Amino acid sequence: MHALTGLSLVSLLSFGYLSWDWAKPSLVADGPGEPGLEQPSAPPPQPPHIIFILTDDQGYHDVGYHGSDIETPTLDRLAAEGVKLENYYIQPICTPSRSQLLTGRYQIHTGLQHSIIRPRQPNCLPLDQVTLPQKLQEAGYSTHMVGKWHLGFYRKECLPTRRGFDTFLGSLTGNVDYYTYDNCDGPGVCGFDLHEGENVAWGLSGQYSTMLYAQRVSHILASHSPRRPLFLYVAFQAVHTPLQSPREYLYRYRTMGNVARRKYAAMVTCMDEAVRNITSALKRYGFYNNSVIIFSSDNGGQTFSGGSNWPLRGRKGTYWEGGVRGLGFVHSPLLKRKRRTSRALVHITDWYPTLVGLAGGTASAADGLDGYDVWPAISEGRASPRTEILHNIDPLYNHARHGSLEAGFGIWNTAVQAAIRVGEWKLLTGDPGYGDWIPPQTLAAFPGSWWNLERMASARQAVWLFNISADPYEREDLAGQRPDVVRALLARLVDYNRTAIPVRYPAENPRAHPDFNGGAWGPWASDEEEEEEEEEAGRARSFSRGRRKKKCKICKLRSFFRKLNTRLMSQRI
């Protein structure tokens, strides 16, 4: 599945600007880090505690060490003392990143290729997938989740506590009020969404979510023995919309001209302080010296809601670098070479085998994983085993006006939205999303005409090719000059697509309305619907093995309406 090719990685300066004065193959180990104290005197007496912190919609430019105007002293310090991941990739929207983190598999192998899981959809992370916390439980870990789930909840079996977490406090949907925890999925379809375990946590309403989640992490640490390995998954709601922040954080950004940027900056700084409190609790309760802290964003910043991905192209929801290049670093006393920047190619699917390996377990491509164990690359500066990334193939998003099978050399329909990185080359087909280069927002009102101008500039294309090492800003399209590379990468897309399973994107169910669940979002599926879903999953597995069976007439009719509904919902998105 993974082609081994030469790869030149991207150099990222600590101020967030990408340099052009070097090219270094990915198969060469990183340069030396700070000597001396970086070598631990002895192996840890037990598997390390693992703390994975995931932020929501934090842009590439929205951290101090990338030259931002936002204050993030904690993140800056932790990154400086650890290993900055400056060739790190995530997915462009919420659900795909979270699903790949917890399964180690690309979207094409879980059926979540299209969009996100919406609150009223009978859909969730496939139940036949063994999740990262389940693997860590097998290794003797206590597992806890705090924050945003966004991987489906229509059945109780989909809930975090049924997918490997011993405890859970957070929201099930993708977007809630930071104080009231209300979420509206359309006019009049509103409900409360804060859960503790499998119960609605009505009594915790009114507390700002970033602070509430940090307090819960501290409580978990205070009540847990450092002698038992611990996995903490902290998925902050911050800094996703709505833009809400405690007043004391807003005051320090009162001179910012752009209101959205001002609120967003306050939220980022509040989140930074929450990370400081979590780190302090790790030290206070005796966990820190045997801990590995991973920090990651989930997708690019939403540029018209305060975020910034400058100087990268694009934003959240796009396959340009601004949508898929992630913020990431690892901080740990267990790192063998600290205080350095790693340019090893890393993808969010890699955390699954990497963390399972740290826990003493095994996980590899033989288990159907798309991720690699990148701990030697991170901790020791060795070469990354990864040489390519399938960003995605979305067969339902095939509306690019100028795409065709002919334009894809007869092997690929370029109207289909897809993106792949192989070595130093990146190929995009279909509609990758809005391709602006948007500077940090400083004006009181952002000129929306820039948006339309950029769209018009690329309106007649459906294939792009970039040398990401030489052109990290994606300004020079080489598709016309290098048809040989285009054809080779299209062939890789074809190879990947042969392994894809059908998309899971069902129609919304009216019974999911919170009014039928006491005013809160929560599981709603009946036993009959659960059986039907299991039958559908079985058909999907049979399809992926090439053994589709004939269906009865009513089944065909049902399938027709499902596909029709999917098309309509895709158009709506």
From Swiss-Prot:
A GO-annotated cellular component: extracellular region
Transmembrane segments: none
Compositional bias of kind Acidic residues: 526-536
Post-translational modification: The oxidation of Cys-94 residue to 3-oxoalanine (also known as C(alpha)-formylglycine) by SUMF1/Sulfatase-modifying factor 1, seems critical for catalytic activity.
Binding site for Ca(2+): D56, D57, C94, D298, N299
Cofactor: how and how many bound: Binds 1 Ca(2+) ion per subunit.
Superkingdom in the source lineage: Eukaryota
Keyword Cell inner membrane: no
EC number(s) reported in the record: 3.1.6.-
Location in the cell: Secreted; Endoplasmic reticulum
Gene Ontology molecular function terms on file: metal ion binding; sulfuric ester hydrolase activity
Modified residues (3-oxoalanine (Cys)): C94
Record's keyword terms, sorted: Calcium, Endoplasmic reticulum, Glycoprotein, Hydrolase, Metal-binding, Secreted, Signal
Glycosylation sites: N277, N289, N467, N497
Protein task: Displays arylsulfatase activity at neutral pH, when co-expressed with SUMF1; arylsulfatase activity is measured in the secretion medium of retinal cell line, but no activity is recorded when measured in cell extracts.
Protein family: Belongs to the sulfatase family.
Full protein name: Arylsulfatase I
Organism: Canis lupus familiaris
